[in-house]
Amino acid sequence: EWEKNSLKPWISKHPERESEFKTRTAGIKVGRLYTPLDLAGSYTDKLGFPGAFPYTRGIYATMYRGRLWTIRQYAGYGTPRETNQLFSKLLSWGQTGLSLAFDLPSQCGYDSDHTLAEGEVGRVGVAINTLRDMEEVFAGIPLEKISTSMTINATAPIMLAMYIAIGEKQGTNISRLNGTVQNDILKEVVARNAWMLELEPSMKLAVDIIEYCTRHMPNFNHISITDYHFREAGADSVRAAAFMFADAIEYIRWTLKRGLSVDDFASQVSFFLGSYMDI
């Protein structure tokens, strides 16, 4: 009835700009209007309810009405002191978590005075060479009360160990530490190239983190598997998602071989997605 009485008369006088509308990146066709009829007979299968399979409407029953998502800006200035000052300001402005950016030498395992680090020190994040550097980054910040995300992969075991040491120095039981370490070395090898060891020892270190956090830091996301970097490297949304899930399967296989049950560690596996305009 709407098409007959409203749409058709209007289009006869005011044609649409395009004969067909598609999403900007993946070219998915977008309909003119969507109604409950589009889900007729499959509402619970495709949409469902919050906190219930297939989780289209969220993994928690109340979602943001119960608790807002953590608000944190990916940030890291050249020196630890500058980064600490930035973090303190962000927290005073109402930010509810921290997201630490490392410079490329720190990501690839080079000290700041290494010849290969020349020109890159402190450029895309903070330079971390020692535990003292990391202590300066988090000076005056109680780790027990804040969630920290660290976008670090090849040197993730080192940076996470430093973070744990700071928590212990603050008198925090490490089981109460909360945050995320990216620890996704496969996407580094395939799409980004910030890796330092061959694949097998790199995977061993990644699973070392998964196992350690599972056993000692149950609130910490021990891996954040990402499709974003595949998109930036040229993959479309379908292939990027495929790479991401292929990586996830491989991490799970390696962790199962370590002797852990999937129910032990899977709840702290997180994902990082680049949705572009197709969301």
What is each stretch, according to the model?
Residues L33, R72-Y74, L100-D103, S149-N153, ...:
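Generic beta-strand/beta-sheet core signal
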Residues R65-I71, E144-K145, H229, S267-L273:
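Glycine-rich, often proline-containing surface loops adjacent to acidic residues and nearby aromatics
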Residues E1-R132, V137-E144, K169-T172:
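Acidic/polar, glycine-rich intrinsically disordered N-terminal extensions of enzymes
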Residues Q95, A117-L256:
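Active-site cavity-forming subdomains of large catalytic enzyme subunits
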Residues W2-G31, P36-S42, I158-L160, K169, ...:
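Gly/Pro-rich turn-and-neighbor structural signature
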Residues A40, Y77-E82, L98-S99, L104-D111, ...:
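Flexible loop/turn segments at secondary-structure boundaries
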Residues Y60-Y64, T214-M217, V262-D264:
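Short glycine/proline-enriched loop/turn "hinge" motifs that connect secondary-structure elements
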